[in-house]
Amino acid sequence: MTETLKARLEFPNSLIQAQAVRTLVAAVLKEKGQNEKICQTSTKGPALESLWEQCSSDSTVVRSACCNALVLLVEQGHADLPYVLNTTLNLLPSARNVQGLIKVVGRLLQIQAGQRENRASFTCPYSIRSFPHPYITVLENRPDCWPALLQEIDDFLQLATDKDEPVFVEMLVPFLRYLYCEPQRLSENALLRQSLLRVLLQPREAPESDRLEEKGASSTRVVRELIRSLFDLLPHMLVDSVTAVVELSSFAESLTAALISHPELWRKELTRLALQLLCACQLTIHLGGELMSLLHTLHHIIPAHAEELPAEQVIMGISLLLLNASVSQQTALLDLAVKIVPPELPPPWGASLLVMPLLHVLSCSSLMEALTDTQTHTKNQKLANSLLQTVQREPARRKEDSMQLDLPLSTWYSELQVAVSVLHRVSTDSTSSSEWLYSLQSSLSVCENVPDTVCLLVSHLIFRSDGDLCRLALETAAAIAEADPAKVPCLLPVLMFKLSRVSDPALSLSVLYTLPKLGTHKLCIPQVLHVLQTVGSSSRLRPVALRLLALLWKKQDRVYPDLQRLMCQLDKSSVVMGKDTQWEQILARAACVRDICRERPYQHGGDMLAAIRDTLLQFSRKDQATPVALALQALQELCRAEVVDICSTWKALSPKLLSDTRPLVLKATAELLALVPDLNVKTEEYEKFGSEAVGVLWGYALSQDSVVASQGFKALSEYPESSHTILHLPEQARPIPKQPEVEDEVKQNEEENEEEEDISVPGASYVKLVSLTSLSVLPALETFLTALVRQEMKQMPRGVYHSALTGGNLRSDQGKTVSGIPSFMLKMYEKNKQPGLKPGLAAGLLLCYDLPVQTDKDGRPIIRFLVSRGRSYQQMLATFIHEVNIQPSEWHRSLLLPQAWRGFMSRAFHALLQGRKAELEMLQKQGKESPEELQYQQHYAWLWVRDRLTDVVKSAAKDSPVVQGNSILALSGLAVVLTRYESNLPAQSESGPEAGPDIFPTVHWLSMVIDTLLSIVSSNSNPKAQVFPWFVHRSYSGENTASVIARSCAALGLALLVPVLVTWRRDSIPSILGTLEAGLPGSATADESQALQFHSGLALGMFLAWLLDERVSDISGQSVAELLMKHLKRLEVCCFDPNLEYNAGCVLGVGLVLSSLSSSSQCERDRVHVSHTLDRLLQSLQDSSNNSRMMQEVVAYSVACVGVSAFSAGIIEASKAEESMNTLRALTEESQQTPGFALALGQTVFGLSSFGHGKAVDIQPRLLAAWTKILLAEGCPTMQRLSALNGLIALVGSETALIQMKSECEETSLQHSRLNEVIRAITQIITFSGTIGLQSNGACLLGHLHLTHASSRHSRTAVPQDFGYLSESSVIRASVDFITEAGRKGPEFTAPQRVKTLLSALAAVGADFQYPPVNWSSVLSPLMRLGFGEEVQHYCLELAASQTQSSQSASLFLGVWLVPPLVHSLSLRTRAHLYESLSCWMKHVAEDKLQVYVDSLAVQQFEPLTRLQRLSLCLSILHGLSRAMTAPNPPQNCWSVLCSTAEKIYNLLPDSIPAAEVALYEAMCSCLSEMSDAEIDRIVKVSEANVEKTAFILSYLVSKGRVPLLGLNDVISTILQVGSKRPISWLLLQGLHQSRFASGPNTGVSKRMEWLLELMGHIRNVAYGSPSVKCVDVLQGTDFLLGVFAAAVVSWADHGGPLLVGIRARWFPWPQSAELCHGLYANPEDTELPVASCLLAIPYSIRKLLDKEPWKSQSQKFIDWLFSITEAPKQAFSETAVLTAKAALMALRSSSEFKKKTVWTRAYGW
């Protein structure tokens, strides 16, 4: 610039300066050239530089001219507009004066706005961030230039108005968005914001318009665009401070004024603005600002637009604001409410929400009257009362709210929407209301701050509902008060208001009794107390008020003076009242005294003593017992707390109480005396008092009044047993005094009685009370007996358990007699000098020979005696082989010999094995053998024993036929023993010594035994291997030369080998059966020998019977049942063929097979067959007069076998069994010298009596006496004595080892005494009788008796048969004896209710204790089989189940009843109990029984047709399974059964959850939760069909923290593939919410956050079509997934959201209710509504979620994810979903991440 030009520009004359500028512009044009354009890339000359410099000149003329020149250059095309604009903006930060530059910017923007073509739509080229608006740049770089900018914008808008160009406004929009919506809200821009608002909305006219119409039109277009632009800014404005509230208020006020100028044009906008202002009001209250300006603005909007407003939202909003507003603010809000709820029209639907706020306003108004302006107070009162009257009227019909805010100012609007949606839900029907209230109650326990919206909804339900729903709402209100006491002042007026409107007395009482429950905080007490005092001001309501005040006092002790005052008012009241009212006051006062003494006896009990005394003395009439009883209850509490001394109290009151006869008073007195044991003091005086109390209570217990008697027994149950004496008992229950036999004893007893008389009560006397007590008192007596049994078990010495099992405490004559038989027989054998007696003694000794093990002083066996004991057995083996006689004609001996030899060989094998190991131990100590050799010999000692015993048999085998027969049976017995021993050996370990060449393998040895026996029996046998060559049985021609006895014994030996064959040669069984069948009478291949035919039939029967015992299902692919029936039919053909001569063995065989079939088969066909064949046998017996004696005997014996077994198995009735018994009895009486008849009769009577057959029980003692007399009578014929001997032996159970009875058939103590009596009689015969035949048979039968009692499957002497070893004072002993006797006599003699009383007592204690050893099956079996009823059966099995842990007999007994057919006779209640107690007994019963009862029968109950009828049983099954699976360390077999059963039941449960079967699914979850994760994944596989079932199961397990949240992913994926189903989202919602409360690693906050982020990624993948995701309908899928996301966010954000929505804190928050039509969903049709509410709550909840750690750190990820929804393809998300995402983004605008410009501009779409 030249100095001349510079001087001109600085010359202070405008003309000169203008010329200078003109010259400068000419210079610029000259510099640029003719066709060039000034732009960024052109050369910048000095003239242009000067021009730019002068644009910021201090001279207004120069500056203005230069700026105009720049704009002119652009307009004329000499300069590039972007270049000029950018250069201007660059100069601004450093410019001395910015007015001109800002003018340039404005002119350039005008040029840009005017460049559009022919009215084409205009889009502003600028934004906020990417291409920032020039004004934004100006403001950010020079904030101080806002006045110039304001002036320029004013000019800009005026120009727009003049030119009628609304696009000019569009050009300003980015700047306006930045200025008003920028989240930082810079304070330096505040003045600009306020000033610009006035500029923007000031009236503008177009002065150059020629006509008025054109003038109005032009101004309207620009102003309308301005108003719309400003209105669009409102939702995006951040209000986070009081300053922001003020600005917003001003903004809204100005905008409202503009909108109201044309209300018809802006109807929707005004409605939305009203809702936004409502949100602004809430923000203002929250921030502590002033509402009046906003409310003033609302008042301008609402009158004209009340119809368009969503009434429920506005009412809800006003209600919430009223609860938190000040008195002055309440006035404006009430005015607002009146406009929404005008008094002249029906109130809008939902207006009752205002009830609680209005009552709150009235309460505040009353309290604040003195501090409030009179006018304001009056107006508030008037408005509130008017509104209260209006909202009580019937509301108008609900209108659908069409108007909703998509982007509200505050997330509070989201809460409003949720609350309104819940209001709609709970208003549809009572089911939805109840479900929401129950859900609310379940969640209140974890919530400290209850949202006001929840209180509004509850108060609405209280106000609008009646009956049960109202009561439920009242309960919920009380729960709210407990959780958040701050809500009490609002709830209390609602209750009082409801009380004033209720006409139902019951509901009024419910409301009244809710009032004290609101006293949950000391600051709430005055308000509640005032209400109760108001109620008490009425004399008729005073009793109720007293009870209410007492309830309040229980919660808050501070109201005790008021309670006392009201009680005193009752005493001193002078008001005349009716008798009923007076009586109510008396009762209320007495009840309060009782409650005070019960609740806080230490603090206030002393104050009540006078009242108690007065009550006891004042009310003595019969109709005044109630207050006395209440006073005694109060006294009881004081004594319990030891406020008063019970002993002194009794002394003072006993004269009056003992003379009282009123049942209610006596009952209360008994309750008082029940405390005596607990308050025991060790003084003589107290002991006397205790004795007196016991006497009084026994007097009550024996009262004729059932109430008094019952309470007497209950009180006595608190006393120790030692307190009772026989003097307390009635005469009938006292023990009968023992009569001494001689005079000396009388004198001695008198002397002892003088010293001390024993007046303790025997247990039997207590039990006698059961028979003497009336049925109505039996439950109380049961309590008393239970207490006695429990005391006895607690004091039971430990030693009893051991000594009972070892016999140390057995009665002197019990057990020892049987165990003394072997020593007696050995002694007789050694002393015997009569050759004729030797075989009988040898046979008897074979059956019972057993040498005791000699021990040292420490109880350890003496080694050398073990060695000699083994040698003794070897010697006796050789002796028995030679001396035991075998007579084929003695059929009973043939039955005994196989078992005799098996038993002896077992004892010999184990004795010799002990001896061998002892011998090797001695050698080891002596060091005579190497350790390796000794180890080898020790390892194979059992094979050494086998070979040693085999050598003994070998050395004797070549002798006579009898010796050969014994050798064969001994060899067979050894094979059986060897097989059983080897099967119990542990598996051969690799480290064990290998067998040397001297060891003959067991399998080969056993094969030799089998083949040897087959070769002896049949000539056609072809041995597979070598045989023992000791028996010469084949001639050179191949004929069988073995003796008849040897062949007969070999046949029996084959039957004995059944266990061996089943283990080693199962495929040989059919051929062996064929071999034995070939020897049957009538067969073409049968031998001519009578003995061989007999033994073939007997051996075949034994074989089949023992094969049944092995429980084998199939042999070589053939069913054992088919094989059995095939050969049984052949045996029966021979048995019943009258033309066969030697078929006695077949008859015995049939009897043995049918006996075994009775006990083992559960097939109805088999049971029918047994019954039918028994009839045929009985008929044969009755028609057998022409048969041989032997044939008659074996038929009788078979009838006895089958009859007893069939009766024990329930196949035949008692009448049929009695017919058999009578037939045998008649035959025995006719032929008294036939031993077989007596044997059969004795066996029948014993068997039937063991199972409770009454007639058999009666006959047994008479037969015993008669036969004993005959046996001991030397003058009787020998055969008659022999018959008596056989009958006696059978009468005490000798044959139970031969026949099959159910395993619970056990002897009783009475049978033991009979057994001992018989043994003594027989030993007397053997010792002293001169009849050798009788002695010989007696010796054999005595040994048989010992074998029977020593070798049964469960030894009858293993445990005592009763509790006789306990003292006579034992109640347990007496109870069991009573039960046993009842089982003998049957229900005809003992009432089932009385049996149940004792059983129930034993079962109750048995659940906690294991009783001392006793044979439970012998005790309980008769009760089960006789008609005592289902209840007795139930307690029998309950008792047995509880004792299985320590009692094998209980386990066996229980096992019999767990399988068909008996299990089907049990009641459903009993079966349910067995399932529920499964964990107690599952380890102790046989595996097959457990398998049947649990894995088979339990699963059957879940079949569709059965399950519906037996839901309770099914539930018990699942509960039992769950408990059993919870048990620590269950055995593997049990665990397998439990898991298998649970899986099968799971598969049978319906895929859709039925309404009444929800509990089954919950119980199934408990079972699954005990399994491993892998098992759960395998069983719970999600499919389209079972998606509802699996969704519930997995949601439930997730809610308990059992499986991770990832377990829900399969459900979600399945829904995406098959389409959404209604209840699934709801199920996931509950599971996600409840998982928050689960403890464990699976549902911790980090796991939940990880899962939610993964879900968000999954939603993104579905929306954007990721190939890894399968989804049939993207839009439907994303809606479902967003629902799941909303469920998680609402559930985990805070506790208020779930509370409002009604999400449950537990799955089943309500009791069983007929109102709720579904056990899980309550109302299946509404399951989507809570999820929809969650979607509405996303903006509200997501903000709360991301405000806390660790979620806060993930805010950016949530924001990015929300962007992925708002910017997703249109087909990916519904419009609602996109709006929800935008609202959620807006909710986060307070976060630091959102305030980044890149984020908020993107979120706003700018």
From Swiss-Prot:
One Gene Ontology cellular component: focal adhesion
Principal place of residence: other
InterPro entries tied to this protein: ARM-type_fold (IPR016024), FOCAD/RST1_DUF3730 (IPR022542), Focadhesin/RST1 (IPR045163), Focadhesin_C (IPR021392)
Gene Ontology BP terms: regulation of post-transcriptional gene silencing
Function comment: Required for the maintenance of SKIC2 and SKIC3 proteostatic levels in the liver. May be involved in the regulation of RNA degradation by the exosome complex.
The species this protein was found in: Danio rerio
Residue segments, region Disordered: 733-760
Protein name: Focadhesin
Keywords, sorted A to Z: Cell junction, Cytoplasm
Compartments in which it is found: Cell junction, Focal adhesion; Cytoplasm, Cytosol
SUPFAM superfamilies: ARM repeat
Disruption of the gene: reported phenotype: Gene knockdown results in decreased overall survival and growth retardation. Mutant fishes have pathological liver features, including swollen hepatocytes, steatosis, fibrosis, and hepatocyte apoptosis.
